Amino acid sequence: MKVAYFDCFAGIAGDMTVAALIELGLPLEVLRRELAGLPLSGYALESSKVERHGVAGTSFKVTLTEADQPHRHYSGIAKMIDESGLKPRVKELAQRIFRRLAEAEAAVHGVPLERVHFHEVGAIDSIVDIVGTAIGLDYLGVEAVYASGLPYGRGFVQTAHGRLPVPAPATAKLMEGIPLTFDIGEGERVTPTGAAIIAALAEGFGPPPSLTPLGTGYGAGEKDFPELPNLLRVLLGERAEGKGHQEVLVLETHIDDMNPEIFGFLMERLLEAGALDVAFSPLQMKKNRPATRLTVIADPADLEKLSAIVLSESTAIGLRYYPARRVTAARRCETRETTLGEVAVKVLETGRVTPEYDSCRKIALEKGIPLIEVYRTVERECGQA
């Protein structure tokens, strides 16, 4: 599975995203041809090689060739994309980004979604940036997007609504739920379009997931900041599936002062948030206190999200994590017919069949028979694949 990791060390904007995808292999002519599926005119595209702090990158610019361009409502943009000649996946990605952007604008201005009126983001260059991002991800075959945290930035920015603090209100709204860094200098580092791309598409935040790199693209922003190169780095890679070695993180903490009833809820929250496995084990701590060790196996991209759950849903005031590797066997999920009815099972590549607990539990409760008897029946009747 191809994945893209957005390393937003200096920030992200729509033009930086398209530029990085061009550097990764999206031809400018393909971008022009695909964008022709939109009923837009009065613009030209250009891309060039640039340098930021000694690092080579690519810039992308949309130049208006007609002065009068209309401002657009969200409903009009959504309809335009839906009725365009764009590919279905490109439409779906672009619609997701625009909807997140519209939801943020609606919340900031206190208006219904259908009444959201775009200014900067309704202009042609922003539409091209968002749809261009969707075209690039589709062209490169990207199936999943992951991202680092985003720099908050500071200062003020001039907008159609006047002088606003950095990040702009819509950007700040879009940043909710995304890890942020606050050690960067003056200036707008994340635009509303850039924040919407990450908020709509990223499946996880933090370090990149385990992958085999295929290429790296550097998309350059217009400004040249003094303290670091104004570049968005996008890593394109192939993520292993099925049997093989997988890089994971192990999160651990020791808890000796929590109501035992809370542990079950904590496990549920972690698993729902994407933890690969959660376990509790007893241990004896200093001063001979009985305690519980919480161990979480996680995808590296989920570190921030799962750490936040542990620290908010338990009495832990800290946790440690370290990298590990695991080997998984290829498997598939099936539904098998038995004398007790249909049962969900996992079938390993060796042919071994293992019953699914939830499915067996449901049968045991419905038929009023012991769970262990359900397991025995399924194992006897399903046996090998």
From Swiss-Prot:
Superkingdom of source: Bacteria
Record keywords: Nickel
InterPro entries in the record: Ni_insertion
Pfam families the record matches: Ni_insertion (PF01969)
Keyword Lyase: no
Listed GO MF terms: lyase activity; nickel cation binding
Keyword rRNA-binding: no
UniProt record similarity statement: Belongs to the LarC family.
Protein name: Putative nickel insertion protein
Protein's organism: Geobacter sp. (strain M21)
